[in-house]
């Protein structure tokens, strides 16, 4: 699929119509016009023909493969129109001279033409393309009808206020787009490659694995790599949501898109730019907002029928009452024009996708990557969550929580011998014991041997040391009376004598309890833990969190347990895992979330990726989803209510046309401002 950036398209309804027209063509497999990011995705067998159709429907639209800045709308024509309109109206009402009145009406005609230039051109283009219910066509029809019933000043005021509204709307849209583009602007735009003693400025995409790049203070790291020389602080807020700078030095892994805050770094490239963390993040966010939620699809379909329906209502208001003898045609045509004033669905067509985009953007800034707006919408409907334990609720890091010596040996003796036996091991349990001892083994270790599933043995200071589980002691016929201990136990024996054991456990993540309590308050009704770990460890964590659990689950068992969990409870269910061993369950869930890091994004298959590995982000993304949904519903209800109110006012004759125009424009601006609140969640 080809991706284009465009300029010259300033109407969201026009974007929807262009997308619909392209998708109707037999030579187009798929077309998506994303108004909020000025992006066109096009998959076609005949690109020249597709581009020609775009030019026919939107002559001012310019396509480019590079992002281009849009020119800001000029306020001069609008200001000129307003000034001349006020002069003309004042002259009509306060001057009795015939020549002044004639001049004033000539001025009104000029104002009408200047203010309505874009409307005339848009209407002409719409009629040529057989789009008779285009907003420009309807606005032109309304003003001509107003002239026809003698409401000359109001006809011109409609055009002036409509132009003012369009100008303010364009400014608001431009501002919102700037916020959205800033979100996607985390990608570096250049790299300084070191070749020998020469420095070359190149595109990040031109870098190869093994290249060396120089990154100065204030510059972005072009792609993922490893620090060869230098020490610095990196700002990774745009990638992980972490506000505190990260300290890096020689041999530290760094992420593309990080901003260098201090010192010069020499970095060896470890990933091509296309595979880098920052490229994946930009791609995920861009792809997310290019999709349409169910609400957006409904609004797009609704807008297709809304305008013709309102036009029909306006026609009925204008014709039926006078034909039935209730008043004259001029009065009812004037009232029917009210319906035409509210015939444009812009308030909904703009605000709904912008609201979802803002929600995705707010999540991204917090280190939460949502892969589609459909996911954000579905997340607001989730009532049930199942958690993996290790690496999700717990840190996935073992710690020594108890040391039990057997007299005459001490805790120090047990830790020392266990450390010496496991000094060459890289197993997480061995590392936790070494960390607890806090000293290095002072004696030479010989004959080190790992025995799969049991433990290790080694010779140290003329002693044979064994460190392992209960089965290890039985294998070597070492007497002991501690066979039924619960938990992860490392027994230690020296020269065939059991000297004690060490209890090792995974620890809960910070704020895990607060997070689950927060989820309950946020509307989650049912939670459980699905773990592949043994019963004791899972039970201990579940007890701390006051949560049901299932332990000793293989991947297929975990999938079946989650299916049962889904079947037992109504509404959508989500699974939160580490994204590594939970693939079947992640795929089964209505919404799937994985705890990971920014460097693992390309490996994740979940709908949502928490790049900062924080449980607080699980609660935050729920709040974002619910607030986004609430804001969008507010906009829909508000816009439809105001439009209905103006139709009623039109029927009763209690307001003038220019008030209807201002009201309709005001609805759009308020809905737009309300949608932008999602960016600040």
UniProtKB/Swiss-Prot annotation:
The chain crosses the membrane at residues 73-92, 103-124, 132-151, 155-174, 309-327, 333-350, 631-652, 661-676. It is a multi-pass membrane protein. It is found in: Cell membrane. Its main location: membrane. Co(2+) binds at residues 11, 14. It comes from the Bacteria. InterPro entries: ATPase_P-typ_cyto_dom_N, ATPase_P-typ_TM_dom_sf, ATPase_P-typ_transduc_dom_A_sf, Cation_Transport_ATPase_IB, HAD-like_sf, HAD_sf, HMA_dom, HMA_dom_sf. GO terms for biological process: cobalt ion transport; copper ion transport. Residues 1-66 form the HMA domain. It is an enzyme of class 7 (translocase). It catalyses: Zn(2+)(in) + ATP + H2O = Zn(2+)(out) + ADP + phosphate + H(+); Cd(2+)(in) + ATP + H2O = Cd(2+)(out) + ADP + phosphate + H(+). Residues 1-72, 125-131, 175-308, 351-630, 677-681 are cytoplasmic. GO terms for cellular component: plasma membrane. The active site is at residue 388. Cd(2+) binds at residues 11, 14. Residues 93-102, 152-154, 328-332, 653-660 are extracellular. The keyword Cell wall biogenesis/degradation does not apply. GO terms for molecular function: ATP binding; ATP hydrolysis activity; metal ion binding; P-type cadmium transporter activity; P-type zinc transporter activity. Mg(2+) binds at residues 578, 582. PANTHER family: CADMIUM/ZINC-TRANSPORTING ATPASE HMA2-RELATED (PTHR48085), CADMIUM_ZINC-TRANSPORTING ATPASE HMA4-RELATED (PTHR48085:SF5). NCBIfam families: ATPase-IB2_Cd, ATPase-IB_hvy, ATPase_P-type. Couples the hydrolysis of ATP with the transport of cadmium, zinc and cobalt out of the cell. This is Cadmium, zinc and cobalt-transporting ATPase. The lineage of its organism: Bacteria, Pseudomonadati, Campylobacterota, Epsilonproteobacteria, Campylobacterales.
């Amino acid at each position: 699929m080809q991706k284009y950036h465009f300029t010259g398209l300033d109407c969201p309804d026009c974007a929807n119509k262009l997308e619909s027209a392209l998708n109707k063509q037999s030579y187009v497999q798929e077309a998506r016009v994303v108004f909020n990011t000025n992006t066109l995705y096009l998959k076609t067998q005949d690109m020249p023909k597709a581009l020609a159709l775009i030019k026919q429907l939107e002559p001012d639209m310019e396509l480019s493969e590079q992002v281009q800045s849009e020119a800001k709308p000029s306020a001069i024509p609008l200001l000129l129109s307003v000034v001349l309109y006020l002069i003309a109206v004042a002259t009509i009402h306060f001057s009795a001279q015939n020549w002044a009145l004639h001049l004033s009406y000539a001025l009104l005609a000029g104002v009408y033409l200047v203010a309505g230039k874009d409307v005339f051109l848009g209407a002409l283009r719409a009629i040529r393309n057989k789009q008779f219910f285009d907003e420009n066509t309807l606005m032109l029809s309304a003003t001509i009808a107003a002239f026809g019933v003698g409401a000359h000043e109001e006809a011109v005021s409609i055009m002036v206020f409509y132009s003012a509204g369009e100008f303010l709307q364009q400014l608001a849209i431009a501002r919102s787009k700037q916020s959205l583009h800033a979100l996607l602007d985390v990608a570096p735009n250049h790299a300084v490659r070191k070749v020998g003693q020469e420095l070359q400025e190149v595109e990040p995409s031109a870098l190869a694995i093994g290249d060396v790049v120089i990154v100065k203070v204030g510059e972005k790291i072009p792609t993922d790599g490893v620090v060869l020389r230098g020490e610095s602080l990196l700002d990774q807020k745009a990638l992980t949501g972490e506000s505190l700078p990260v300290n890096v030095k020689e041999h530290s892994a760094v992420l593309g898109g990080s901003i260098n805050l201090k010192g010069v770094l020499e970095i060896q490239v470890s990933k091509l730019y296309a595979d880098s963390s920052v490229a994946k993040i930009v791609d995920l966010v861009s792809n997310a907002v290019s999709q349409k939620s169910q609400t957006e699809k409904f609004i797009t379909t609704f807008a297709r029928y809304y305008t013709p329906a309102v036009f029909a209502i306006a026609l009925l208001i204008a014709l039926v009452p006078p034909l039935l003898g209730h008043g004259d045609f001029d009065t009812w045509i004037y009232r029917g024009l009210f319906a035409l004033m509210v015939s444009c669905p812009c308030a909904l067509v703009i605000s709904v996708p912008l609201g979802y985009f803002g929600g995705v953007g707010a999540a991204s800034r917090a280190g939460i990557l949502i892969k589609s707006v459909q996911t954000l919408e579905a997340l607001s409907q989730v009532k049930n969550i199942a958690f993996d334990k290790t690496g999700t609720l717990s840190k996935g890091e073992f710690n020594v929580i108890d040391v039990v010596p057997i007299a005459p040996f001490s805790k120090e003796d047990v830790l020392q011998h266990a450390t010496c036996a496991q000094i060459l091991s890289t197993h997480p349990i061995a590392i936790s014991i070494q960390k607890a001892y806090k000293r290095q083994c002072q004696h030479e270790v010989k004959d080190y041997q790992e025995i799969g599933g049991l433990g290790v043995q080694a010779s140290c200071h003329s002693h044979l040391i064994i460190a392992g589980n209960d089965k290890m002691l039985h294998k070597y016929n070492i007497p002991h009376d501690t066979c039924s201990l619960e938990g992860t136990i490392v027994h230690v024996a020296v020269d065939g004598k059991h000297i004690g054991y060490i209890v090792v456990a995974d620890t809960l993540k910070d704020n895990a309890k607060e997070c689950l309590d927060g989820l309950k308050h946020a509307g989650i009704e049912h939670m459980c833990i699905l773990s592949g770990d043994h019963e004791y460890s899972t039970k201990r964590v579940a007890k701390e969190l006051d949560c049901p659990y299932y332990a000793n689950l293989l991947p297929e068992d975990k999938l079946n347990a989650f299916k049962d969990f889904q079947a037992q409870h109504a509404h959508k269910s989500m699974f939160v895992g580490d994204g590594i061993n939970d693939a079947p369950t992640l795929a089964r869930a209505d919404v799937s979330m994985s705890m990971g890091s920014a460097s693992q994004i390309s490996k994740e298959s979940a709908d949502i990726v928490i790049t900062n590995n924080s449980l607080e982000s699980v609660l935050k993304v729920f709040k974002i989803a619910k607030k986004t949904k609430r804001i969008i519903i507010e906009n829909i209800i508000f816009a439809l209510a105001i439009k209905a109110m103006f139709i009623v006012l039109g029927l009763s004759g209690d307001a003038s046309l220019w008030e209807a125009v201002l009201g309709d424009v005001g609805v759009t601006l308020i809905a737009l401002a309300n949608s932008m609140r999602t960016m600040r969640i």
